[in-house]
């Protein structure tokens, strides 16, 4: 699918370019051409609908709540989620921690909390907020935070 979209973009660019050895049209310097070229380049990358924050959260909660989720899918989902430029909402982390508990994977649960702390970066107020929101789940599932385990100290 991506390859087809790239082929369409390359084909549309070839239509705009002059033949090799031919002089560029004088209209290329006009603002109309630049606007057309800008619109054309935007079209190449703007297909598909945009997902709202609520839809994004629901998609990930549903993913981690699948009853047949295995350890590989859990790690794959977390790696994908970590790749986004955001800190996951507490409800997504809650679903991921519950998946860890279903899989009896304590190490992954602690690693998820470490990743959330890392994703919060220099914003020191985010991680305590997330732990505060997750505290009932952590207590229910018997999951310790990295700080409670002493993993935050070198």
Swiss-Prot record:
- Predominant location of this chain? mitochondrion
Q: Which residues carry this modification: N6-acetyllysine?
A: 91, 117
Classify the source by domain of life: Eukaryota
Q: Modified after translation how?
A: In response to mitochondrial stress, the precursor protein is ubiquitinated by the SIFI complex in the cytoplasm before mitochondrial import, leading to its degradation. Within the SIFI complex, UBR4 initiates ubiquitin chain that are further elongated or branched by KCMF1.
| Gene3D superfamilies attached to this UniProt entry | Cytochrome c oxidase, subunit Va/VI
Q: What positions carry the motif SIFI-degron? A: 2-21
Give the GO terms filed under biological process for this record. mitochondrial electron transport, cytochrome c to oxygen
Mind listing the GO molecular function terms for this protein?
metal ion binding
Pathway of this protein? Energy metabolism; oxidative phosphorylation
CDD domains with a match to the protein in the record = Cyt_c_Oxidase_Va (cd00923)
Identify residues that carry Phosphothreonine.
145
Q: Output the Gene Ontology cellular-component terms.
A: mitochondrial inner membrane; respiratory chain complex IV
- What does the UniProt entry say about where the protein is found? Mitochondrion inner membrane
Transit peptide stretch = 1-45
UniProt keywords (A-Z) are: Acetylation, Heme, Iron, Membrane, Metal-binding, Mitochondrion, Mitochondrion inner membrane, Phosphoprotein, Transit peptide, Ubl conjugation
**Membrane topology reported for the UniProt record:** Peripheral membrane protein
Instruction: Give the UniProt family note.
Output: Belongs to the cytochrome c oxidase subunit 5A family.
What is its quaternary makeup? Component of the cytochrome c oxidase (complex IV, CIV), a multisubunit enzyme composed of 14 subunits. The complex is composed of a catalytic core of 3 subunits MT-CO1, MT-CO2 and MT-CO3, encoded in the mitochondrial DNA, and 11 supernumerary subunits COX4I, COX5A, COX5B, COX6A, COX6B, COX6C, COX7A, COX7B, COX7C, COX8 and NDUFA4, which are encoded in the nuclear genome.
Job of this protein:
Component of the cytochrome c oxidase, the last enzyme in the mitochondrial electron transport chain which drives oxidative phosphorylation. The respiratory chain contains 3 multisubunit complexes succinate dehydrogenase (complex II, CII), ubiquinol-cytochrome c oxidoreductase (cytochrome b-c1 complex, complex III, CIII) and cytochrome c oxidase (complex IV, CIV), that cooperate to transfer electrons derived from NADH and succinate to molecular oxygen, creating an electrochemical gradient over the inner membrane that drives transmembrane transport and the ATP synthase.
Protein's recorded name: Cytochrome c oxidase subunit 5A, mitochondrial
Task: Name the species this protein comes from.
Answer: Notamacropus parma
